């Protein structure tokens, strides 16, 4: 398998719900007028708490400098795993489950923090730029590591470091954060960029105007429906994660869906905001899912993490993760 280090240098930022109108001009330009920018990597995710933005340095320049934009203090690089041969059958586990053992767990073992963004097309593993030498050393045995430079994929320079590098002891990784599962059903879909103009007004309404601040806080004690919507435009490909109620607002012939029309349930991870320094959160969730062969998408946001699993698996997933949680006591 190949691990590709993409050339985007990324910023991760958060905007409070009540301040989104300060940024809509730049965000609309990034989402719907990308040909007018040099941005190649843009993702916007709305949660009950905030909007999380992942954007490359060129796109970041489209956003106004503001005290209302909270920016994580590192530059991040996006990695993704490419299976050789292109012969992967549709029955193989998709999403974060596929890379749990080969990527997520080894990085957690070396205390390297990751930030995940699953899309309709692929899974991006974000690591801090300063951690890249450690990432490469950790994964070099498992992967052919390639780097994208000026659009060309070339063998990565050997930045691997061995100094201070110890082979980790295998440790159990119990789930340590509270979990909740909202009642919404979600779909992970896409649309042809050429059809984007026909739904731009609808998307703008979904992203910025419907379900305003008044609906945005749902107590985690009674997990009913929550507000969650994710839009990504990365290297020309669009990915959308939305609940079924939102999906029904779109013309049915525009959205791509899997042949099975699969619906997904969410597991939200975190009671208090998780921050960026703790390692192993993605591994705590993805390893039990991989062991049970359950596919999953995983979306990290500025404050909390979100795993999406097939709706028919949700009870088994919750049970498996609660068993893992119990092991910490």
Curated annotation (Swiss-Prot):
Q: How does it assemble?
A: May form homodimers and heterodimers.
Which gene carries the instructions for this protein? castor2
Q: Where in the cell is it found?
A: Cytoplasm, Cytosol
Protein name in UniProt: Cytosolic arginine sensor for mTORC1 subunit 2
Which UniProt keywords are given for this protein, alphabetically ordered?
Cytoplasm
Its chief place of residence is cytoplasm
Instruction: Cite the ACT domain residue spans from the record.
Output: 72-139, 262-322
- Annotated GO CC locations: cytosol
Give me any GO biological process, just one: negative regulation of TORC1 signaling
Record's keyword annotation contains Zinc: no
Q: What protein family is recorded?
A: Belongs to the GATS family.
Task: Extract the Gene3D superfamilies matched here.
Answer: VC0802-like (3.30.2130.10)
Function (record text): Functions as a negative regulator of the TORC1 signaling pathway.
Q: Which organism is it from?
A: Xenopus tropicalis (Western clawed frog)
